[in-house]
A protein has these predicted regions:
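Cytosolic, long alpha-helical scaffolding segments
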Residues: 1-223
């Protein structure tokens, strides 16, 4: 591999890693705000993602320029395709986190009683956060990252995510049925929490893309 091309790949990987770190920071602060009822932190959490779209576009542009300048062969082409798709997944995760943070703030300020599902929300959020942290660790240590092991770890978190969401969905459906005029607010909460469920799916997609980049084979991702 040409040194200039390898340097460009490392630069793109670093840009993706930085974008992911901003999403993680936003997720951590949103979780802290919810756990500790620190409503002022929600806006701070979203500020980490204020340049999300432009940052993702800049990464895409670098990838496209690399395609054009270096004409990569099969293995390198596979890596660039994976990076391009990963950026799209991160953009969607970040956008989902921004909306989740905003809506969770609204639920908290609205005084809606979420006590019956508070612990489950926290655990659900942690599964999505752990998956993102595993992805970040892999991007930070290219030589040490075992993509197969990463995929297994992220799948474990996604499985926990699914189980927790199912539990919480049942609790919320009970609240929707029994809460009269507040039912519509609990429907909104259910929609908010689906953002975390989708984040888990997209984290699996990124792990699958890293596995594809490292090992090849068929690529299977959630739509």
């Amino acid at each position: 591999m040409l040194p200039r091309y390898e340097n460009k790949l490392n630069e793109i990987r670093s840009m993706i890693s930085t974008l992911l770190s901003q999403i993680i920071r936003s997720s951590e602060e949103t979780l802290h705000a919810f756990e500790n009822s620190e409503n002022a932190l929600y806006e701070s959490a979203r500020n980490h993602l204020k340049n999300l779209q432009s940052d993702a576009n800049r990464i895409d542009n670098e990838i496209i320029k690399t395609f054009a300048l270096f004409g990569p062969e099969a293995d390198e082409l596979r890596l660039l395709v994976a990076y391009l798709k990963m950026t799209n997944e991160l953009d969607r995760i970040g956008d989902g986190m921004r909306k989740y943070s905003k809506r969770l703030e609204e639920h908290s300020l609205g005084g809606l009683d979420l006590s019956v599902i508070t612990n489950t929300i926290i655990q659900l959020h942690k599964t999505t956060l752990h998956a993102l942290q595993y992805l970040y660790e892999c991007l930070q240590s290219k030589e040490l990252c075992d993509a197969e092991e990463l995929y297994r770890k992220v799948m474990v978190e996604e499985s926990k995510n699914d189980d927790l969401f199912s539990i919480m969905e049942k609790e919320l459906l009970t609240l929707i049925i029994t809460s009269g005029e507040l039912s519509v607010e609990y429907v909104k909460v259910l929609g908010t929490l689906r953002k975390l469920e989708r984040s888990g799916d997209r984290s699996v997609n990124i792990a699958a893309l890293l596995l594809y980049a490292q090992k090849g084979g068929e690529l299977h991702i959630y739509s």
